[in-house]
Structures are given as structure tokens and as C-alpha cells.
């Protein structure tokens, strides 16, 4: 009987250790959005953030572009801080330096998820497509 108790205790300890290790390994996620006149992007972003963070696997930060009419050249996200970039964006094409930084991020192994119509504004950007 003692052998079974020790065995169960050992399994509990192993599961506890693996669970706490998994919880510490959070995927830092940047969600890019803004300037989308055809979708309710704010609500979609909040919903996606809630789903991702409720899994316990992700920590999501929003990065928004300037509103329509604003200077898109002020948009300078720091991709290097993140393991994953989620693009939920339908506005102006990103400035050339941001495009290059994004391409380098992906080339260096950064993760990317493109949501729905986020390919539309980048139609002329070969590397993005």
C-alpha cells in the first residue's frame, strides 16, 4: 500500500512541476490593429486577447497604428520584444522601415498570425504575401 501512496505522490509532484513550468513559459504577443474602416477591429482585438490570455499561454499587448488621417510614419513597433505578432489590420501600408523590421523579425524566427483581411492593405508587399 505504501508503494502506491509513494507512486501517487511522485506523479502529483511531477504533474505539479510540469504545470508550473508550462505556466512560466508565456508567449509574449503583439497584436497590431487600427485604421480598419470595414470591421469592428477594437472588439475583435479584445475578444482575441481574452481568448489567448485565458489559455494561460499568452500575454497580449496591443499596438495600434495612428487613426486614419494620422501620420503612419509614427508607427514604429518593436517586434524584437515579442515571440508572436498577430496582425488584425486593414489600413495604410506600413512605412518601409517597419516593413524591413517585420521581415527581419520573421527571418529571425518570429511567429506571425495574419487575421482575415489583413492581407489587403499589403497587396504590393511581396515578402508579406
Language-model features, listed with the residues they occupy:
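Bacterial Sec-dependent N-terminal signal peptides
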Residues: 1-24
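Residues that line or immediately flank small-molecule/substrate-binding pockets and catalytic motifs
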Residues: 8, 89, 119
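Aromatic-Pro/Gly-enriched surface loop or interdomain linker
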Residues: 22-81
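A glycine-rich, often tryptophan-bearing local segment used as a flexible ligand/cofactor-contacting loop or short
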Residues: 32, 92-129
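Short, acidic/glycine-rich phosphate-metal binding loop used to engage nucleotide
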Residues: 37, 91-92
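Structural motif
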Residues: 84-88
Amino acid at each position: 500500500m505504501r508503494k502506491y501512496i509513494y507512486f501517487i505522490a511522485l506523479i502529483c509532484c511531477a504533474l505539479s512541476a510540469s504545470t508550473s513550468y508550462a505556466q512560466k513559459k508565456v508567449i509574449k504577443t503583439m497584436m497590431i490593429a487600427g485604421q480598419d474602416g470595414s470591421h469592428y477591429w477594437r472588439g475583435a482585438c479584445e475578444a482575441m486577447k481574452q481568448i489567448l490570455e485565458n489559455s494561460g499561454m499568452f500575454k497580449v499587448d496591443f499596438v495600434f497604428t495612428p487613426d486614419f488621417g494620422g501620420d503612419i510614419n509614427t508607427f514604429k513597433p518593436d517586434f524584437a520584444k515579442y515571440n508572436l505578432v498577430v496582425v488584425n489590420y486593414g489600413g495604410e501600408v506600413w512605412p518601409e522601415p517597419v516593413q524591413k523590421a517585420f521581415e527581419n523579425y520573421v527571418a529571425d524566427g518570429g511567429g506571425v498570425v495574419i487575421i482575415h483581411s489583413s492581407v489587403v492593405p499589403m497587396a504590393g508587399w511581396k515578402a508579406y504575401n
